[in-house]
Amino acid sequence: YVVPAAKLEAIYPKGLRVSI
């Protein structure tokens, strides 16, 4: 499923980027 970038930022404060 696709998660909003903001949500990912919240989960990964280090700035992890997931390729979509």
UniProtKB/Swiss-Prot annotation:
Protein location: Secreted
The protein's UniProt keywords, in alphabetical order, are: Immunity, Innate immunity, Secreted
GO BP terms: namely:
innate immune response
* Coiled-coil intervals, chain numbering: none
The UniProt entry's GO CC annotations, sorted and at most eight, read: extracellular region
Function recorded in the entry: Involved in the recognition of invading microorganisms causing their aggregation. Activates the phenoloxidase cascade. Binds specifically to beta-1,3-glucan. Binds the A.niger cell wall component alpha-1,3-glucan, a fungal pathogen-associated molecular pattern (PAMP) that activates the host immune response.
How does this polypeptide assemble, per the annotation?
A: Monomer.
Family, similarity comment: Belongs to the insect beta-1,3-glucan binding protein family.
- Full protein name: Beta-1,3-glucan-binding protein 2
Q: Where does this protein come from, organism-wise?
A: Galleria mellonella
Q: What is the lineage of its organism?
A: Eukaryota, Metazoa, Ecdysozoa, Arthropoda, Hexapoda
